[in-house]
């Protein structure tokens, strides 16, 4: 899969039961945050599941469906999640996809052919089923969840307000309005107080309508 492509229309089995991405997520107006991990009962993946569990409510508040996946069996998933609960006191609240036949992993092109496991991948998909962000991480590195939340919030503001976000943007900071497409618009833009030049104009975050902001 590539950025801006349509997410596959498919059904999967998870630790919370069957999941149809379009019927259960996109058609309900939700975003999808899908993250793949290489294998159950591995050290880095365990720390990630503890971390993602702690921010589950934050994703839920943003109307984003958080879902994990790997090519392990559903029974391996269940046993691993039980182990996490026993050792860390955390009940993983989001569904974990079992993909032992690697069908979804191959559709997403996230199989490491040498080891046969899923790579450490992330997909953020909007309610139209379009991939708006994707990233791959080495097997030895854990993801920075705080940064993934920031990217998710940026994607939501971009989607709702049709604005861009500058370097190191955080919710509450200025956004960038689209560049003008005609010379007349460019000349008008240069007269605005927040215009750095004709193609770069900022807008205060609190000037966006309330329903276009995230916090």
From Swiss-Prot:
Subcellular location: Cytoplasm
Binding site residues for substrate: 120
Pfam families xrefs: 1-cysPrx_C, AhpC-TSA
SUPFAM superfamilies cross-referenced by the UniProt entry: Thioredoxin-like
E.C. designation(s): 1.11.1.24
InterPro entries reported in the protein's UniProt record: AhpC/TSA, Peroxiredoxin, Peroxiredoxin_AhpC-typ, Peroxiredoxin_C, Peroxiredoxin_TDXH, Thioredoxin-like_sf, Thioredoxin_domain
Note: The active site is a conserved redox-active cysteine residue, the peroxidatic cysteine (C(P)), which makes the nucleophilic attack on the peroxide substrate. The peroxide oxidizes the C(P)-SH to cysteine sulfenic acid (C(P)-SOH), which then reacts with another cysteine residue, the resolving cysteine (C(R)), to form a disulfide bridge. The disulfide is subsequently reduced by an appropriate electron donor to complete the catalytic cycle. In this 1-Cys peroxiredoxin, no C(R) is present and C(P) instead forms a disulfide with a cysteine from another protein or with a small thiol molecule.
Gene Ontology molecular function, alphabetical: thioredoxin peroxidase activity
Catalytic reaction equation(s): a hydroperoxide + [thioredoxin]-dithiol = an alcohol + [thioredoxin]-disulfide + H2O
Family assignment from sequence similarity: Belongs to the peroxiredoxin family. Prx6 subfamily.
Active-site residues (renumbered): 45
Span of domain Thioredoxin: 1-157
Self-association state and partner proteins as the record states: Homodecamer. Pentamer of dimers that assemble into a ring structure.
Record keywords, A-Z: Antioxidant, Cytoplasm, Oxidoreductase, Peroxidase, Redox-active center
Name of this protein: Peroxiredoxin 1
GO cellular component, one term: cytosol
Role description: Thiol-specific peroxidase that catalyzes the reduction of hydrogen peroxide and organic hydroperoxides to water and alcohols, respectively. Plays a role in cell protection against oxidative stress by detoxifying peroxides.
Family matches, as PROSITE patterns: THIOREDOXIN_2
A biological process term (GO) from this entry: cell redox homeostasis
Signal sequence, start to end: none
């Amino acid at each position: 899969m590539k950025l801006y492509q349509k997410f596959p229309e498919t059904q999967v089995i998870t630790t919370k039961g069957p999941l149809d991405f379009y019927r259960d997520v996109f058609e309900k107006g939700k975003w999808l945050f899908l993250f793949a991990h290489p294998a159950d009962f591995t050290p880095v993946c365990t720390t990630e599941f503890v971390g993602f569990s702690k921010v589950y409510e934050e994703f839920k508040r943003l109307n984003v469906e958080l879902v994990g996946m790997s090519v392990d069996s559903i029974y391996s998933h269940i046993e691993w999640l039980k182990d996490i609960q026993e050792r860390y006191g955390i009940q993983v609240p989001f569904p974990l996809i079992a993909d032992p036949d690697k069908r979804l992993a191959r559709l997403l092109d996230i199989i490491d052919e040498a080891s046969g496991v899923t790579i450490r991948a992330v997909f953020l998909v909007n309610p139209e089923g379009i991939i708006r962000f994707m990233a791959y991480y080495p097997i030895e590195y854990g993801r920075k969840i705080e940064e993934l939340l920031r990217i998710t919030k940026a994607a939501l503001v971009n989607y709702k307000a049709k604005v861009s976000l500058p370097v190191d943007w955080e919710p509450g900071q200025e956004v960038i309005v689209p560049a003008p497409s005609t010379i007349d618009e460019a000349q008008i833009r240069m007269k605005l107080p927040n215009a750095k030049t004709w193609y770069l104009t900022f807008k205060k975050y609190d000037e966006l309508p309330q329903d276009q902001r995230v916090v």
